[in-house]
Amino acid sequence: MGKLKIPVGEHGYVLLKDWMGTDLSPVNDAKVSFDKESTELGDREKRLIKYLADHQHTSPFRHSVLKFEVYAPLMVARQWWKHIIGSEHGEGFDRLTAWNESSRRYITEEPTFLIPKPDAWRSVPENRKQGSGDPVAVEVGEKYTEALQKHIAESLRLYEVAMADNICPEQARLFLPAYALYVRWVWTGSLQAVAHFLNLRLAEDAQKEIRDYAQAVEKLAREKFPVALEALLNA
């Protein structure tokens, strides 16, 4: 068995906390219609998994569940959450998803922020609709890395002053730069919901920061459902 926790970037990670089911689960969840069951994952079972995925018979994939803990910048978390909300317009993807996030109303651990390295800043894409283009010149990146560092340092100073003056955490947090701030959350989804997330966030036009996390989710999910996930991602 591989690692259950994968580092992402300088500070982030994805941790597989728990799961329910195996590759054999969607097979037997589909076979219940005929009051049959398989005890081993052979070629027939693998063909059935592929058939179910290819023909969008997705309900058998909703009984298997994965539970992740994620530590990522808020801008990644909000994209992730938007995907979960949007899935309600699909074939019930949201019915087996859950989300619980840490709150700075209650915790005062030292804030962590995403600060891109000078060579990690990206340009506006040619079509200008969304996403990003090629990296900007390093000297331009250096300017904005330094500017962001100064901005965060001043924000942290104001946050700490407010806390020292007995301002409540739920208001003191207003001084923290939101989108760069790392947050921690637990995300639980059915195997189908996880595959739906991966199909969107592994795409080349997905934002790099969330794509990095999606690659970690994929590695962890493949550890537990190699055949079923492959079928869903290639359907």
Feature roles, as predicted:
Residues M1-A235:
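Family-specific signature for flavin-dependent thymidylate synthase
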